[in-house]
Amino acid sequence: LRSVQRLNPALSELQARQLLNEITLILDNNDLGREFYNKLSSNSNIKLIDFQDADRNEWHVTTEFTCENQDSGDSFRPDITCFVNGLPLAFIEVKKPNNHDGILAERERINVRMSNEKFRRFLNVTQLMIFSNNQEYDNENRVPIQGAFYCCTSRDKAFFNVFREADKDFATKYPYKAVSDSVEKQILQHRNCVVIKNLPDYNTNKDTNTPTNRILTSMLSKERFLFLLRYGFAYVDRKIELEDGSKTTQLEKHVMRYQQLFASLTIRKKLDNGIKSGIIWHTQGSGKTALAYYSVRSLTDFYAAKNTAVKFYFIVDRLDLMEQAKDEFVARGLSVRTANSRDELMSDIRSTNLTENAEGKAEIMVVNIQKFKQDSAKIQIDSNYSIRLQRIFFIDEAHRGYNPHGSFLANLLAADKDAIKIALTGTPLLKEERESWRVFGDYIDTYYYDKSIADGYTLKLMREPVETIYKEKIENILDKLAGGIEVRRSDIDRNKIIEHESYLNALIDYIIADFRR
């Protein structure tokens, strides 16, 4: 109550209490906390958190904070709970290194809690959950057995994400507040564990460079945590197909992956330094469309602080990619416009209208340039607007449609010299493609296959030799297709071979047999 009144001095005590009562009610919603999060992170006149000045917020930590449903008596007590302005927005579960079942036991425990409706209110208010047994990650094991992981709430199953700090010295160089011996003793007395102060493990665990302390500093230091609270979560209305063939929508809550967090922070840093273009190389399947969504929210506020309005464009070169991107943005709550022609796009670019939807949602235009990407006609953009306007282009796999020597995209970006150009890719670039991409500048952020495999997002492909019996069978089929004629392998049309029914049947038989083993 005190924090609400301090951040909102225009509210009377009665109005502040009514606001807190409203929050209590919406936390009981069966919406994974969406309504509460929208209220927490919004730019409305009513503030629950001051996102601009970290020191205007009240920060507290407690141990074994009891979360109890008074009606049922069900309860649990996280090891550590973090409060911002009295709201329990994060908790940490910590275990000893080399503990039985590693971190798996914690994952199973939180999955049980997530499926228990009696805990819905507390899980709806909790934004970030961290689990650690203070060991380094086992990169050879896709199952999270050891390490420090984070997740957000879910209907029934938590997805444990790894966190790898981009700045290796972030934790060791962080300006921690010194804790006096008397305060340390007071904390240990409060926990009734003064005796552990003389144990070797105690001093080891206090080291800032342990896995647990690194993730806590990376994610819960004030500025980082406020950034995550403001921009790092997304509610996704995912379309799914049920067993009976019917389709429905399932609500999911997502938290930024660490590479999306660092790319978002680096984009802002580059813009602050006057750099208006760059390349983000994140491997396929790592969430580049989601990164664009997070960036819409982050960069809207970034330019609002400069009294500048923003229009966002996401450019693809195929119709199916346009539909896919549109669906991803809509599922996350953006209002999406589309353009399939040059005229549609140029009309929108020349317009000073910032929003077209009645709900006031953030907007993005998804553009398919497939039909007109080779259009080399010059483009004229009038920049004499009565409002300060910044256009931001996300170019998805731009190397496929970008020709610096004369194409629609090249002419468009050249005509809008003040535009922000963020090129996205996740595929290896050929030499000639790298040359054309130099116009976008240096890399903003990279996230390669090796990290994606280690993080469990990408499966490692294992090359295995084909068994002799099947190799001989396929060789016989090739001989039959040649009709008994002696020919060189280089003279055979490979496509006709691999599309032939006899070849396909033999190959499918081998694959099925291999999987059954």
Please identify what each model-predicted range represents.
Residues 131, 365-368, 394, 420-425:
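Structural recognition of the conserved hydrophobic beta-strand(s) that form the central parallel beta-sheet
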Residues 344-365:
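Conserved motor-coupling elements within RecA-like helicase/translocase cores
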Residues 84, 272-276, 305, 358-361, ...:
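Short basic/glycine-enriched coil/helix segment immediately N-terminal to the Walker B
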Residues 384-420:
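SF2 helicase catalytic motif II
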Residues 283-284, 399-401, 415-432:
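Conserved helicase ATPase motor motifs in RecA-like P-loop NTPase domains
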Residues 1-311, 316, 320, 324-335, ...:
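ATP-dependent helicase/translocase motor core
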